């Protein structure tokens, strides 16, 4: 990262061009889809492979391109009022802590009003690993993310290694 910062003046124009071509063509470059898989120790016996989980390490340039699209998508979702105030993920000043606080306040308010409260909790760990890509792309289309931008997401999701 330090090297990239030091060379930024020399490399920024070519990368801006690559990023713009990616957005305009609806193609996420295959070279930026390559990740290095590294084992991350969780806990317990370091000799037991079950105590590790794989993590994907992407290139800095891939992360920059992803962040640029994230900002574009978030702007679109805000502009078209697609995200509700109760949406805590991927929102500024929102987190698991604010979601928990909102939940606790809702439960307390219901109990104070003598209403019944039912909680259903789901463990969605590894949800990104199992989501059906066609369903996701169709949902984006439903929300107005169509054409070249939807193609970009399709390209992003395919041929990853």
Regions found by a protein language model. Give the residues of each.
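Conserved pre-catalytic core of RNA-dependent polymerases
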Residues: 1-161
